[in-house]
Amino acid sequence: MFPNSILGRPPFTPNHQQHNNFFALSPSLYSHQQLIDAQFSFHNADLSRAVSLQQLTYGNVSPIQTSTSPLFRGRKRLSDEKNLPLDGKRQRFHSPHQEPTIVNHIVPLSDERRYSMSPLFHTHYVPDIVRCVPPFREISILEPREITLPEAKDKLSQQILELFEACQQQVSDLKKKELCRTELQREIQLLFPQSRLFLVGSSLNGFGTRSSDGDLCLVVKEEPCFFQVNQKTEARHILTLVHKHFCTRLSGYIERPQLIRAKVPIVKFRDKVSCVEFDLNVNNIVGIRNTFLLRTYAYLENRVRPLVLVIKKWASHHDINDASRGTLSSYSLVLMVLHYLQTLPEPILPSIQKIYPESFSPSIQLHLVHQAPCNVPPYLSKNESNLGDLLLGFLKYYATEFDWNSQMISVREAKAIPRPDGIEWRNKYICVEEPFDGTNTARAVHEKQKFDMIKDQFLKSWHRLKNRKDLNSILPLRAAILKR
């Protein structure tokens, strides 16, 4: 896949092990962790891996036994492999086939990679600070309990479930993204040897679809210095180097790399092998934290994921789900759904930040963030509303009940709270509080025309759905399923 694709290199010798607090992992906590030794075959059209598990030992590290077979054979994908159907076997929540272990890990580098090319840091490579970022495991660890889909006795609820089962992200989709992340991390470490790359957003937060892009966060500085990366200067400079690297060294594997100079600059690109579109940012640490906050909400109650998916599809169909065009981001939409479920007379969701503040503190080090969902048990709500009623209620709430002029949506507080007086909230038509840093996730909606269009769509869709009780009245079901 990429030029330096050789997974499973042995760790450094004990005298070169890192001692930095950010990466220092307790042997007692991680003695049973395992790494993936993945062998990828382009002969397999669904990009499946043969996975063997190896024991990861901390303290006096003995070398990890690694596969002798190369990860990639250097052969590009055959043309007839590119157009294979996306369909894989659909899985319900209670499927006995759990998702595989997904590892966001940093790999020790060989001697030829020892010096950073970045003029920003001028940092020589020091082996004793590099080791492993703990694994970001998928459902088997993050969601160990069995979750079944809610019952659907009415037509509208059945349609929502049908859409969800057809469009939810599959294991194979996640494998493709994780494989690309692993290889990109190795390549980016040619530029920044101390960096590590995290898969974030809908790919891991439980709200992904078959067509979801991959979001990547490049962490180049260690705690507690994360927020010292200036997004207007340093982040752009870092991404300029990454973009140049993609355009030159990886031009055969990545296509259409584009540097977007937004408030949080990103590099957009497409992986030729997986055909997945990616957005890569630098040190947007809050994105890593909110990924696991949202994942906790996603699996806290079995109606959450289907409801979020149908609302995202509805918003996209009506052109109100694109922050780059002045409407709502998917993240804002998810927070709006969670807020609605928190504010029902009989809430379906609580504020888990209030109930478990120690698990979702902004000060928790990154290598511990992925443990948060494991600490939260299922939430048993007395609310028995079906999915159809909840979708109707969501549309009605934002069409007729929520006060856009004076209120802010707060998932952290589990209620609507008064708008702040800060400059970021002035002249903004929609205010959605980011649960960790308190910023406005809906700041892109800054034109009255776009705001009116959003409100109008809530109102029209509510009336149509209330009268017909058919999802097709607001979202063509067949077309939505085909888009995935």
Swiss-Prot record:
CC per GO annotation: cytoplasm; nucleus
Ranges spanned by the short sequence motif Nuclear localization signal, renumbered to the chain: 76-92
BP-aspect Gene Ontology terms: hematopoietic progenitor cell differentiation; histone mRNA catabolic process; mRNA 3'-end processing; negative regulation of miRNA catabolic process; RNA 3'-end processing; target-directed miRNA degradation
InterPro entries: MTPAP-like_central, NT_sf, PAP_assoc
Enzyme class: transferase
Keywords in alphabetical order: ATP-binding, Cytoplasm, Magnesium, Manganese, Metal-binding, mRNA processing, Nucleotide-binding, Nucleus, Phosphoprotein, Transferase
Reaction(s) the record says it catalyses: RNA(n) + ATP = RNA(n)-3'-adenine ribonucleotide + diphosphate
Function: Cytoplasmic poly(A) RNA polymerase that adds successive AMP monomers to the 3'-end of specific RNAs, forming a poly(A) tail. In contrast to the canonical nuclear poly(A) RNA polymerase, it only adds poly(A) to selected cytoplasmic mRNAs. Does not play a role in replication-dependent histone mRNA degradation. Adds a single nucleotide to the 3' end of specific miRNAs, monoadenylation stabilizes and prolongs the activity of some but not all miRNAs.
Family, as annotated: Belongs to the DNA polymerase type-B-like family. GLD2 subfamily.
Official protein name in the record: Poly(A) RNA polymerase GLD2
Originating organism: Bos taurus
Gene: TENT2
